[in-house]
Structure formats: C-alpha cells, structure tokens
Regions:
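RNase H-like nuclease fold core
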Residues: 1-49, 53, 57-63, 140, ...
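RNase H catalytic domain
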Residues: 11-17, 55-153
Length: 176
C-alpha cells in the first residue's frame, strides 16, 4: 500500500466567541505542481473549522478508488484526538452529541466521515505535531537542527498556507 503524507493547518483571527478571518492549508510534500498545496481564506470563521477544512481537503485529494495509507500531520489536538481517542465514533453512536450537547462543527465532521466512507481502500493515520517549534526556539543551533526535520518543514508549509492574508479574496461561507 502506498503512503501519502499530508500536513494540515487552519487558523483564524478571532476574539472570544466571535468569528474572524481565517484560512487553511494542506501540503503534500511528495506531490508536485498544483496537487502539492491547497489553501483557501474565509471571512467569519473559527480556527476549529479551518483545521477541519484542511483535513477535509486532504482526504478529498485522494482518489476514491485508491488503496493508500493517508498520514496526516496536524498541530490541532482537537482534530487528531477526535480520531486517536475514538471521539468521532462515539459522537456518531450518540447521534452527534457529546457531554456538552451537540458536537461543534457537526457539518464538517459529517462531511469528513462521508469522504472517509467513500474511500474504503484508504487507511487514515493521524499524528499530532507541535506547532511553531522553529519560531519558539531561541538557540540558533537548535533552530538550525529543527530546520532539517521534514515534519517541521511540512508543518511550517501548512502554517504558511493557512494564513488568510495570502488570499486576495476571502470566501464568505466556510461550508463544504
């Protein structure tokens, strides 16, 4: 089974419960040309929605009949733990409810689940990666060493793609 690696990131500039401008990025380091990177920017959204949108578009980039192992690196614990801790399965079994009530971003979670179901030959592995490691590192030698790590580079690429300011036009709806 072939392995496809993707780095995903989402971000939004929000204050409290308000929505703000945001974007997401999906980066495939082993692909080339227009298939290597994808991003969109939005008005009136939140970070969680952008993180999920990045995952959604990474999944939809895989052909329905492909027998591949899709490995997603994400700095979003919310997204990664929803898979690794089995939260998504629990939400589905509970009618899209959790201990706080209705699952947030249910429309995106349903769309992700649908796309996964459409790809029965694909397996999905979710891996959490710490964000902004290079920017946080003060020591120059350690910073240089971090820049040699392909996972750090992939995360940085997805982070740059997720910046809504790189888009000349922001979409008004973040619905998939």
């Amino acid at each position: 089974m072939n392995k496809v690696i993707a780095y995903t990131d989402g971000s939004a500039v929000v204050k409290g419960k308000a929505k703000g401008h945001g974007g997401f990025g999906t980066y495939f380091p082993d692909l080339y040309g227009s298939k290597q990177a994808f991003s969109l920017g939005f008005k009136d959204t939140k970070t969680g929605r952008m993180e999920l949108s990045a995952l959604y578009y990474a999944i939809t980039a895989i052909r329905i009949d492909s027998a591949v192992e899709l490995v997603i690196y994400s700095d979003s614990e919310y997204v990664v733990k929803s898979f690794t801790l089995g939260r998504l399965k629990k939400w589905i079994a509970a009618g899209w409810r959790n201990t706080s009530g209705e699952v947030k971003n249910k429309d995106l979670w349903k769309a992700i689940k649908h796309e996964l179901d459409m790809r029965p030959l694909m397996t999905l592995e979710m891996i959490h990666i710490r964000s902004h490691q290079v920017e946080k590192e003060k020591d120059a030698a350690k910073k240089q060493a971090l820049m040699q790590d392909p996972n750090i580079i992939g995360n940085m690429m997805a982070d740059r793609l997720a910046d809504y300011k790189r888009h000349t036009e922001l979409l008004t709806s973040d619905k998939v």
